[in-house]
Amino acid sequence: PQAQVWSSRGCPYKCIFCVWPATMTGNDPDGTQKRSVRHYKPDYMEAFLTELMAKYRYRTIYFDDDTFNLGDKHVERMCAVMRKINVPWSAMCRADTIRMELWQEMKDSGCFGVKIGFESGNQEVVDTIVNKRLDLEYARQAVAEIKRTGMTVHGTFTYGLPGETATQMFDTKRFISTLGLDTLQESGTAEIEGTPLHTLRNSRSLAKYSGAKLDDEYVPELDGRVKYDRLAALLRTTP
């Protein structure tokens, strides 16, 4: 059995589809509200995890923070905690928020795998639609370094973003083929209420949100099944 825990709350990023700000840091549909991040203190995490493992006999720990590796100091402190706890662990991470050498430190403290959200393999989509602020070439290098340490990498991608073309979706498929991921999650875009993407779908306008780019190719579909079937058919074809 695996315990799912958090070492922080909040996220400073403003991805257009993310439900986290609406549920954890206040409803922020236009992307203008400041995003705060709170890290639990190492002493608290050590006591909490020690009690958790002793009482419920979990064998592994998964840190489901929106971004576990948000800054070198937090990762270094949590690695020190996990060395004391001495159980295998994994975490939800970004590819670009710590020094490359800290991936090895995570591995040495018991981390066996990370989950990373790329969302798209097309840089324009990442920059102007998702608003993820992620350099895909740097992310590719990070995956190579993570794999070098012996940790596994689970990658997540989403299709059907507003303004995303078929060619850009196929760019994602090609990008995936270059990463050497251990496992993969591909999803259709869901416009969840409270997110900038939901506001965009309903009004076709998101003037205050600087990350999204709306164009004539974006056709909101209220019937999720229709959207899913269309995406599935498209991705089965050969670019």
Where are these regions (language model features)?
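Radical SAM [4Fe-4S] cluster-binding motif and immediate context
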Residues: 1-154, 174
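Noncatalytic linker/hinge segments flanking ATPase motor cores
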Residues: 101-107, 130-137, 153-161, 194-202, ...
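Short linear sequence elements within intrinsically disordered, low-complexity coil regions
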Residues: 18, 22, 73, 162-164, ...
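C-terminal accessory regions of radical SAM enzymes
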Residues: 1-4, 167-239
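Conserved strand-turn element in the central/C-terminal portion of the radical SAM core barrel
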Residues: 121-126, 130-131, 143-168, 187-193, ...
